[in-house]
Amino acid sequence: MSGSSVSRFSLYSGGMQNLNQDLAQFLEQLKARGVSANTQKAYSSDINDLLVFLSDTKQSLDLEALRSWLYRISEAGGSKATLARKTSAIKNFTAWRADSDLADQDPALRLRSPKLDRPLPKVASELSLSAVFDRMASQATQDNPVGLMNHCAVELLYATGMRVSELAGLDLSDIDHERQLLRVTGKGNKQRMLPYGLRAKDSIERWIRFGRPAVEAPSSPESLLLSSRGRRVGVRQLYDVVASQLETTNLGSAGPHTLRHSAATHLLDHGADLRAVQEILGHASLATTQIYTHVSVERLRSSFEQAHPRA
């Protein structure tokens, strides 16, 4: 950016007002693209944090200021994950400004994101999950709508590997009973079709036949899962249901994402194609799915070391 154009972002010439206006437009653009509310909120928080820093230090939006801001966060104890998230937010914002002709160039183009030490996801054993499903099935009696709903929810999360937010958003019209397919709306409002097996099919049918009518009200939405008050089940409630059920697994404390991790890993353990698993999980990049191959290899190594006489 040239010296004359830098003044556009100088705090002494109304630059902060321009940046705040740009941020408002950027957030509107994210919303229009169907970016999740949580991502919008995180971007808003991180970029506002930068704007406060620029205001406090009377700096312009340039590479040096961005590095100073990230250094300050690091010195204050910010983790690599925090720095990576904030860097991503800023790079998206400044790239959008440049593409929208609100800036002559992108000051974050040379800004590097810290490499994260990515831990392998936690995976519940098939044996411990079988015990969970057996227990839940015994509680899912015709006169127990809560038990039927809980069983249906957990069966579907594991059967399909879907995100808990995707499950919460499912409507009755998203179910193709004949072909045993679910139409799931994922990140960025992208839709995909997910197959489910006979056990999930049974749990869906029992919930719809016996459980859902018991809690349904005239004002109830068309959502597949309803709370005891006849409302769409929220992500928080589903998280609590899964967490309470998984306490008895080999992992102890775990949430819905553990079921997603477990589904992906067990699919690969049983020979599923990596690209098929990518499609099932709704990952934009195959690299995101590849972490499960590492989990599968580690599980293979562990089994070998425990079972082979010459390990």
How would you label these PLM feature ranges?
Residues S2-A311:
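Conserved catalytic core of the tyrosine transesterase superfamily
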